[in-house]
Amino acid sequence: MQIHTTIQSLRAARAAVSGKVALVPTMGNLHDGHIALMRQATGHADSIVASIFVNRLQFGPRDDFDRYPRTFKADCERLEAAGVAHVFAPDEGEMYPQPQQYHVDPAPAHVTILEGEFRPDHFRGVATVVLKLLNIVRPDVALFGKKDYQQLMVLTNMVRELAVAVEVVPGETIRATDGLALSSRNGYLSAEERVEAPRLYRELARVRDAVRDGDRDFLKLETEAVAGLAAHGWHPDYIAVRRRADLQPPGDANDPLVVLAAAKLGHTRLIDNLEI
């Protein structure tokens, strides 16, 4: 496995690769969900590139940029074991040698709702760095996890509307045996909070099952789920049933749906979703 810290080095290595290339962007602090994406990528390409870059642009003033764990050595060991051929790990000066003046501004309808309401400019930062990574690596395939469902929707639309020559492949959410979605932020939970954390999944599953059984009173289901979390010390930001395609409120009864949630448990904000 080769580790590249400069754009020039990565591009030279990319030029020497024959066959299909897959990119899996990460911010490091890898868990089994990331590794599942790497293994999934092997089914779509001959060579896998994983990026490790903690992107300041997608962190808000109250987010945890400085607190985000950096575990580079352990990450590289896991990536090599998963069959990754190249790691692109630039520092901030390499990715942003001067303050970034050009950005990708996603459609307001996609980024002022749900996560966008609570994290202004987050998706602007995500879309900007991902487009930059796609331009650097020039992969045939890029993989993103469904756990960040709104991010996946934004990036899929960005790639389509900007005619980027890459196939976006979604990866299923990987969960602990108790249902908690794997996330780098789970490490912030105390022992007691970790026991409580799967309740977020259970509330989502309850909404999903009710809708599958024919309940179309989405507001009632959302309100009950919020109350169920709040009764156990959570501080929910939202639980919402939305259309998968654009995360707008459901319309036609045949629209494929997803239920999404974000809530704070102690000092840790968790997000999750389930397709219906």
UniProtKB/Swiss-Prot annotation:
Active site, UniProt feature: H34 (proton donor)
Positions of ATP binding: 27-34, 145-148, 174, 182-185
Keyword set includes Hydrolase: no
Principal cellular location given in the protein's record: cytoplasm
Compartments it resides in: Cytoplasm
Keywords, comma-separated and alphabetical: ATP-binding, Cytoplasm, Ligase, Nucleotide-binding, Pantothenate biosynthesis
SUPFAM superfamilies assigned: Nucleotidylyl transferase
EC number, as in UniProt: 6.3.2.1
Protein name (record): Pantothenate synthetase
Organism of provenance: Aromatoleum aromaticum (strain DSM 19018 / LMG 30748 / EbN1)
Gene designation per UniProt: panC
